[in-house]
């Protein structure tokens, strides 16, 4: 994906007021919960413009904050879901631009790289192979999607063809697939340090889940299920 696409994505992410509002609430409340659990701080009272509130049930307050963070996690995900899809396209397109993984020879109309043995079509017949997209459908289900078309008496039907990367044959071996998963992990992992939008989007989840786990452990909720 081009640099222009990345800049456009960051601009949309930064200017989405709904997403940013939910993000601030989730991060703020999660940090508050973590601070309470790590330091043992307690709420004594809260001043409002009308009256003063005193907190006498600290465990009840912890349950309230627990439910609040859980609710905010769900709300944040509903706002961030389509950004996750675009983020996936960003790192996966970077991976497929790696010549060691996939390289299309325009003159020979063929594919080189790690995926050459997994792709059983010729570029002359299927020119859309040069526009392949990485496709994840399960925990270890991977594939390539490329645009193609079918000519019939009613006209031309355009669709995307799937090449399964878990169908081992014709030189495509399990060790090649494991190597591909290694590249996938590398591109996802390095994205967190090289591209700030990854941590911007995923960071609130990390704080929220950490706050939930620590609070559940402090309240002893896990012991009731053991």
Enumerate the language-model features and the residues they cover.
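Charge-rich cytosolic interhelical loops and cytosolic tails of multi-pass membrane proteins
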Residues: 83-183
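Cytosolic/matrix-facing juxtamembrane and C-terminal tails of multi-pass cellular membrane proteins
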Residues: 1-14, 171-184, 188, 223-226
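Juxtamembrane boundary at the C-terminal end of a transmembrane helix
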Residues: 211-226
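N-terminal first transmembrane alpha-helix
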Residues: 1-86, 91
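Transmembrane alpha-helical segments and their cytosolic interface motifs
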Residues: 17-32, 187-215
């Amino acid at each position: 994906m081009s640099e222009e696409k990345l800049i456009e994505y960051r601009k949309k992410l930064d200017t989405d007021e709904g997403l940013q509002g939910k993000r601030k609430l989730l991060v703020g409340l999660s940090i508050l919960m973590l601070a309470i659990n790590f330091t043992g701080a307690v709420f004594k009272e809260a001043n409002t413009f009308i009256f003063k509130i005193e907190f006498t049930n600290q465990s009840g307050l912890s349950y309230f904050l627990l439910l609040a963070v859980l609710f905010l996690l769900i709300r944040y995900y509903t706002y961030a879901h389509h950004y996750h899809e675009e983020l996936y396209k960003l790192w996966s397109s970077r991976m497929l631009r790696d010549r060691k993984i996939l390289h299309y020879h325009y003159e020979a109309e063929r594919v080189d790289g790690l995926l050459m043995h997994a792709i059983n079509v010729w570029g002359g017949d299927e020119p859309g192979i040069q526009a392949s997209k990485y496709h994840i459908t399960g925990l270890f289900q991977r594939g390539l999607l490329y645009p193609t078309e079918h000519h019939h008496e009613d006209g031309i039907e355009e669709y995307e063809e799937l090449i399964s990367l878990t169908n081992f044959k014709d030189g495509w071996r399990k060790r090649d697939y494991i190597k591909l998963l290694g590249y996938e992990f590398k591109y996802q992992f390095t994205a967190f340090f090289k591209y700030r939008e990854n941590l911007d989007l995923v960071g609130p989840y990390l704080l929220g889940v950490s706050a939930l786990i620590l609070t559940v452990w402090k309240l002893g909720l896990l012991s009731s299920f053991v």
